[in-house]
Amino acid sequence: MYHGQKLAKLGRESHHRMLMLRTMVTQLIRHERIKTTLAKAKALRKEADRIITIAKRNTRLSHSLVYSYVTDKQVIPKLFKELRLRFGDRPGGYTRVLKAGSRLSDRSKMAYIEYVENDLVPLRDYKANNSKFAVIRKPTPQGTVFNFEEKETGKIYSSAISLNNRFKRLEQLKKQSTSSSN
């Protein structure tokens, strides 16, 4: 039974899970946006909001609690000088989780977690510039077919090809293009 379960287990033992979340909170403070799996992002949201709430108190106890939690001490000044002031009037909800599709290798759901009110490039522009493939959805009488268009070359790959064969084919095309240019 799952009564009273407060945190997802994430397939790890408790000490490994807590260390992973501490490390991810530290990286989130440093970069203000990270990409991870959806389950980890949801678990991380709770911890990241808790650390910001502790930092907003700005007491000696809050400094020692944050100092013992964060894995890299170089991010502590950013937390107390920048993030604490940014979220001073906000009562909660310091992070947002944005879904980012599926990972190609194992099809696990991915997500971005970021602090709200940040100065980063908006995520729509960020994804559009860094995506290698565009997904083309084509409805057919048999069902919906998904094709992948490579943005650099404009070539379209059918979803009937397995992922492994698609990557082998991409490697072959790269070899052909380098050999033809020589």
Swiss-Prot record:
GO terms for molecular function: structural constituent of ribosome. One of its GO terms (cellular component) is mitochondrial large ribosomal subunit. It is found in: Mitochondrion. InterPro entries: Ribosomal_bL17, Ribosomal_bL17_CS, Ribosomal_bL17_sf. Keywords: Mitochondrion, Ribonucleoprotein, Ribosomal protein, Transit peptide. Gene3D superfamilies: Ribosomal protein L17 (3.90.1030.10). Its main location: mitochondrion. It holds the Pfam family Ribosomal_L17. SUPFAM superfamilies: Prokaryotic ribosomal protein L17. GO terms for biological process: translation. Belongs to the bacterial ribosomal protein bL17 family. This is Large ribosomal subunit protein bL17m. It comes from Dictyostelium discoideum. The lineage of its organism: Eukaryota, Amoebozoa, Evosea, Eumycetozoa, Dictyostelia.
